[in-house]
Amino acid sequence: MWCVAELDEEYIEKMEDVLKTYEKPYNPGEPVVCLDEKPVSLHAAVRPPQPAAPGKLARRDNEYERRGTANVFCAVEPQAGKHFTWPTPDRSAAEFAQIIGELTNHYPSAKTIQLVLDNLNIHCRKSLTDYCGDRGGGFIWNCLTPHYTPKHGSWLNQAEIEISLFSRQCLGKRRIPDLKTLRREGRAWNRRLNRACVKINWKFGRPEARKKFGYDKHLFKRSMGLVSSAPSSKCLSSFP
């Protein structure tokens, strides 16, 4: 169940912007890319696991050693089936700047990258200018057209689906002991998905949002200060 804390003008404005971006026909010159990140706990086995043998299941000890945490940036171009995974030591402004630089390198011919992301404080131009300088960071940022999801609206970011796939298909219940292993496994998972060209079939658009939340788009114009009679909060019992 997805819950919206407050359905106000700002929330609807940003939601409509993101959904409008998803509704655009596929255009390789303006790819729509969704980006998000997640922490990953690192665990090492205390005793070597026992592999499967004829008539015996694989076994591993319940005891493990904590090795701290890492971070994974996940990006996906849903319409093209392109997947990107960048494990990093942490989630910092410098790491974000490096990831954005690498992302833009994958689209050298794009007029702009329509980038969907949340409102995390490092998801901004300043992260790039602090790391790359005003000129270099500004140049990279200008390759993007950012679309921010509203607060408590992370469900609008298709990168959340990508993270879920990564967690289930790549990480699973395995123990990842270090960043090197995480990067190796992430690259292998990326290659499999990109070879298969796995796309995301997103079906929740602006018409569905207006029907689900019961608002009229014409009542939400921030410049006019109009207030809608739409409910202040709503839960999506089934999504999409």
List the model feature ranges, each with a label:
Residues 1-13:
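Short Lys/Arg-enriched helix C-cap and helix-to-coil transition segments
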Residues 94-114:
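Short, basic/hydrophobic alpha-helical segments
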Residues 5-6, 46, 181-240:
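C-terminal domain-tail junction helix/linker
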Residues 34-36, 75, 81, 100, ...:
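Mobile genetic element proteins and their domesticated derivatives, centered on retroelements
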